[in-house]
């Protein structure tokens, strides 16, 4: 998590940001609506929720891009749990084709490095029930 207290604090801050803010504003509005709502038999996705989630995702994408303009990894100059958490959330959204990769080149480059790691290969082979993955999902060099 980093050697100095400020580095560890930044890792924790980013993790909390994903687990609270990103989860509430993006994941619940897109993934919960598109994937889990139908599986639970709760009807069709709410277009209002999807729209809100997509607007929020663009804001979060801009923040990730800003972070990576100033650092090598999400929380600093070292790979950390913050990168793993970020990659996990983005992976699901990427699977669904929701991420605007054409707008966020630094984030795309960072994510391609994560997708290329041997530990990420199994994730790229997973399937979300009957939902097909986006065309580029399994390709680390998308």
State each model region's role.
Residues 66-77, 119-123:
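Surface-exposed helix-capping loop/turn segments at secondary-structure junctions
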Residues 52-56, 103-116:
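Extended, well-ordered alpha-helical scaffold segments
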Residues 50-67:
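Amphipathic alpha-helical packing segments from all-alpha helical-bundle domains
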Residues 22-26, 64, 71:
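Short, structured loop/turn "capping" segments at alpha-beta junctions
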